[in-house]
């Protein structure tokens, strides 16, 4: 087996004796170090010496001999160097930063610190001598008569050298644990040893000592090393004893006549029987009450209370407690115990561990009477917790169960009740309810005690709740019995609840008052009338608008002045959608969104620069509109532009922002200036308001004419689209090409090419002949419609962004390219030589109005390009989608049936012609770059095999575009 583990605190008390020496040694080392530094520094430096030292140091830096000679007054080189080492950091600063005054202040502070440390060292030495002298003291040993009950305390080292500490330790029997260096030196109360000493000490001396200790603790304001110890002795039990003792001494001036008998009873105890804990469980509070009364007898102080009736009642209680066994039975009755527990309901926070063990020995001396009592109540007794409802037929509880229940973690006082008549049981439950009500009102203890009469018989009961209040101080008679019908509805017996906190009570009261006010509000006659939906919404809106933040948000969201409304009503994105005929579309496809994004370009980042630019634009717009309004007022024949709102005039009703409160108010315009106007508010008088803070009362009347027409047009388009919408289509809203054709654009785009229209139709026909699946046919039609819409959208976007001159170049180039490709295809299909083919191309160009002859090198190059693209795209005939790549078979002679990519050839020729046209004349670089983007988009092939060539073309065009954009001026 492993050896027995030894206690770690065997020799702990010797460490306390050695610790002062260690502290003294460390203090002495610090003192020696300071003395050594002071010796090097020499005598205290005067101000003149410091001034001379500073001047010499600035003059002879590092030459300490010259500095010492300049200082004079027998200052050695070592002293001067020591002074420099002490203030090295300060003296190293530049001459403008450091000064003589700073050096003098630092040395003055140094000397003051040295003086303070020396005075503290002297006090420390004196305390060490006192501690060593008092260390040899030992507490007085108790007489031999007490050694059987009291464990001899350990020898405790004196803390801070106070003899009264040892006296208090011996008197109240506090044991100090063996502690280490860092353990706080305050005493811990030992309950059972304290009670043993109190049992064998006279009650009058013990009470006087306790009162003296309490008085000293109350008078001591702080700073004493024993404050924590004295505060630990002031437990709730002792405070309760002291207050009750003072109260009892005034009520019983002649209580000294009982002192001898009480002292005899205390001295007759001897060795206490530990089995008295069982009786304490049965009559715990009765025993506690008896001890409180005896402490009250031993007191000699008087209180200020002059309640004579209360004094007589307390005297009756004391006489009942000293009565023989005849009255002991009535004291142990459940009714009397319930009264005791109710009187001390606010003092029951202590558990059984805090109850003194002297209560056990106090009842042990009356063993004969207790045995008789146990035999008398063994048959009908019952025991139950207070939370369990009381039953009439009680069961007998064994002694083992009582002991087991007393060993709980947080035990409660459990009383062995005696079966009483029905009236007593009901009275007890009624009195419990009454006590709970009184306790919740926080009434004084003596008021509750004065309202309760002693129960001298088992059939004693109280009358009504009103007769037992604090104001009514009558003693209820023994014959007053409460009828059974009055207390039948009182329910089971419950423990009175803890009094609530006053702060929570005030909070509950305030909440109750608010609830009452709400009830009063709802109890008005209008609350019975059911509000309509309109009135309910109006009330909610009024409540919402009562918040300032909501009103500010409404101003930012909906308040627009007459001068700013056209500017903010114009949205570039909405204008673009209306221009291409998609302003009425609630949803767009992915292809449409991609086209829109590519057309609008890259958006600007939301930054401070962007916001500042927008503000500058708005300010310029405002100034231009104000200038136009001023000219319009000066000239009677002036015409208002269709994109401007009608200006405000005198007498118009407006909604204006008050310049002081920044709240919206109704008003009327009195005068109009360039950018301000005088507004007469309905309730706030006349104020000068900016024109941007005035909104017409009816904004529709001041709307610009152009904006009004645009809104009407959008509404008409939306109405038409709503009528033409297919009811069964739940996917993306698709519009037929007729909708796009009916839209009147400002710039007429070129009609869709024949290949673009023919290609989806042919693709649908091929799929319809190869399969009979109806869903595939529908999908092909949908795809064709989307492609057609996308092409029209591209042409529209190009026409919108480019200048008219650039648009003419694009149209002319594509027309020439289409004629050349058609002539070349016809010539190739006819099988004639190169000269005949060239003649056919010239004829085609002359037919479309082209008067410039082409070089001979152009046509062979075009023809070579045609056959090259044809040979490249010839491999795509065997793919899964041959018709989707834009191939159209040219039916000529039966020998040559090679399909020709006419669309791609036309785009290439048109691109070449565009580049040739813009090179003949100088155009703006931005327009040229935009035209090149159009060329690159037109060259995009549909065959995947041509994508590498397209990437090369795209790269080359990007380089050219970058060089052109470098010529664009940026402001």
From Swiss-Prot:
Polar residues bias (residue ranges): 450-470
Entry-linked Gene3D superfamilies: 1.20.58.1880
Q: Where is this region: Disordered?
A: 1-40, 117-137, 197-260, 326-371, 421-507
The subcellular location is: Nucleus
Q: Give residue ranges for domain SANT.
A: 40-98
* Entries under InterPro entries matching the protein: DIRP, Homeodomain-like_sf, LIN-9/ALY1, SANT/Myb
List the record's Gene Ontology CC terms alphabetically: DRM complex
Q: Has keyword Iron?
A: no
Q: Where is it made, tissue-wise?
A: Expressed ubiquitously in vegetative and reproductive tissues.
Q: Which Pfam families match?
A: DIRP
Basic residues bias: where? 1-11
UniProt feature, compositional bias: Basic and acidic residues: 209-219, 332-350, 424-440
Which biological processes are named by the entry's GO terms? DNA-templated transcription
**Which UniProt keyword terms apply here?**
Nucleus
The regions listed as transmembrane in this protein's record are: none
Full protein name:
Protein ALWAYS EARLY 1
Q: Which organism is it from?
A: Arabidopsis thaliana (Mouse-ear cress)
């Amino acid at each position: 087996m492993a050896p027995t583990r030894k206690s770690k605190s065997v020799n702990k008390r010797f460490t306390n004796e050695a610790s002062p020496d260690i502290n003294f040694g460390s203090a002495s080392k610090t003192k020696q170090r300071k003395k050594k530094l002071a010796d090097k520094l020499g005598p205290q430096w005067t101000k003149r010496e410091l001034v001379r030292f500073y001047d010499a140091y600035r003059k002879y830096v590092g030459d300490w001999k010259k500095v010492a000679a300049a200082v004079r007054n027998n200052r050695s080189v070592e002293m001067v160097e020591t002074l420099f080492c002490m203030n090295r950091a300060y003296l190293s600063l530049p001459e403008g930063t450091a000064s003589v005054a700073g050096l003098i202040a630092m040395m003055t502070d140094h000397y003051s610190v040295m003086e303070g440390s020396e005075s503290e060292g002297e006090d420390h030495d004196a305390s060490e001598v006192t501690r060593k002298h008092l260390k040899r003291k030992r507490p007085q040993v108790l007489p031999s008569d007490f050694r059987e009950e009291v464990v001899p305390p350990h020898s405790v080292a004196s803390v801070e050298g106070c003899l009264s500490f040892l006296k208090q330790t011996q008197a109240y029997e506090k044991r100090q644990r063996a502690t280490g260096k860092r353990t706080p030196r305050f005493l811990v109360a030992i309950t059972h040893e304290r009670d043993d000493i109190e049992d064998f000490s006279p009650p009058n001396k013990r009470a006087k000592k306790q009162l003296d200790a309490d008085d000293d603790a109350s008078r001591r304001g702080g700073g004493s090393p024993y404050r924590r110890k004295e505060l630990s002795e002031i437990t709730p039990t002792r405070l309760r004893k002291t207050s009750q003792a003072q109260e009892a001494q005034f009520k019983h001036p002649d209580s000294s006549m009982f002192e001898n008998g009480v002292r005899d009873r205390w001295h007759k105890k001897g060795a206490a029987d530990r089995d008295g804990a069982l009786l304490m469980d049965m009559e715990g509070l009765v025993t506690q009450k008896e001890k409180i009364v005896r402490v009250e007898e031993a007191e000699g102080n008087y209180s200020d209370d002059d309640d004579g009736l209360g004094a007589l009642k307390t005297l009756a209680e004391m006489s009942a407690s000293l009565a023989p066994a005849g009255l002991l039975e009535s004291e142990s009755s459940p009714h009397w115990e319930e009264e005791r527990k109710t009187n001390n309901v606010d003092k029951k926070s202590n558990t059984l561990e805090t109850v003194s063990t002297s209560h056990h020995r106090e009842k042990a001396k009356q063993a004969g009477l207790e045995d008789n009592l146990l035999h008398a109540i063994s048959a009908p007794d019952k025991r139950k917790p207070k939370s369990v409802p009381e039953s009439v037929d009680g069961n007998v509880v064994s002694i083992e169960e009582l002991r087991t229940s007393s060993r709980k973690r947080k035990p409660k006082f459990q009383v062995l009740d005696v079966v009483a008549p029905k009236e007593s049981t009901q009275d007890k439950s009624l009195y419990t309810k009454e006590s709970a009500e009184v306790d919740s009102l926080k009434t004084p203890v003596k008021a509750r005690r004065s309202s309760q009469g002693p129960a001298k018989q088992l059939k004693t009961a109280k009358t009504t709740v009103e007769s037992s209040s604090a104001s009514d101080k009558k003693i209820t008679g023994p014959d007053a019995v409460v009828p059974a019908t009055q207390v039948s509805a009182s329910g089971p017996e419950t423990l009175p609840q803890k009094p609530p906190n006053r702060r929570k009570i005030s909070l509950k009261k305030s909440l109750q008052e608010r609830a009452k006010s709400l009830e009063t509000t709802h109890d008005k006659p209008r609350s019975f009338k059911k509000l309509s939906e309109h009135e309910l919404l109006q009330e909610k809106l009024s409540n919402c608008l009562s918040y300032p933040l909501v009103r500010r948000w409404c101003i930012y969201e909906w308040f627009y002045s007459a001068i700013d409304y056209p500017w903010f009503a114009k949205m570039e994105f909405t204008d673009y959608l209306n221009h291409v005929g998609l302003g009425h579309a609630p949803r767009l496809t992915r292809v449409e969104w991609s086209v829109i994004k590519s057309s609008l370009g890259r958006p600007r980042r939301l930054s401070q620069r962007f916001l500042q630019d927008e503000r500058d634009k708005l300010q310029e717009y405002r100034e231009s509109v104000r200038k136009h309004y001023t000219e319009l007022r000066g000239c009677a024949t002036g015409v208002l532009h269709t994109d401007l709102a009608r200006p405000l005039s005198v007498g118009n009703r407006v909604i204006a922002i008050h310049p002081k409160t920044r709240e919206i108010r109704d008003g009327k315009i009195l005068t109009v200036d360039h950018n301000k106007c005088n507004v007469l508010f309905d309730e706030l008088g006349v104020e000068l308001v900016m024109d941007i803070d005035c909104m017409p009362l009816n904004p529709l009347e001041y709307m610009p004419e152009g904006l009004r027409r645009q809104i009407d047009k959008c509404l008409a388009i939306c109405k038409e689209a709503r009528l033409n919408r297919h009811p069964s289509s739940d996917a993306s809203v698709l519009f037929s090409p007729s909708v796009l054709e009916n839209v009147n654009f400002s710039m007429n785009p070129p009609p869709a090419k024949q290949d673009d229209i023919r290609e989806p139709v042919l693709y649908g026909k091929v799929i319809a002949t190869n399969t009979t699946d109806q869903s595939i046919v529908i999908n092909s039609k949908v795809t064709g419609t989307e492609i057609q819409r996308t092409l029209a959208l591209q042409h529209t976007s190009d026409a919108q962004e480019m200048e008219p001159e650039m648009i003419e170049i694009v149209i002319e180039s594509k027309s020439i390219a289409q004629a050349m490709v058609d002539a070349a295809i016809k010539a190739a299909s006819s099988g004639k030589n190169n000269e005949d083919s060239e003649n056919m191309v010239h004829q085609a160009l002359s037919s479309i109005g082209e008067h410039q002859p082409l070089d001979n090198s152009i046509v062979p190059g075009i023809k070579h390009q045609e056959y090259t693209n044809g040979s490249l795209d010839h491999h795509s005939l065997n793919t899964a989608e041959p018709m989707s790549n834009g191939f159209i078979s040219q039916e000529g002679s039966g020998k040559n049936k090679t399909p020709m990519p006419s669309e791609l050839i036309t785009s290439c020729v048109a691109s070449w012609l565009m580049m040739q046209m813009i090179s003949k004349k100088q155009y703006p670089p931005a327009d040229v770059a935009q035209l090149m983007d159009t060329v690159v988009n037109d060259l995009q092939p549909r065959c995947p095999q041509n994508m590498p060539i397209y990437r090369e073309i795209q790269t080359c065009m990007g380089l050219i575009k970058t060089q052109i954009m470098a010529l664009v001026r940026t402001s």
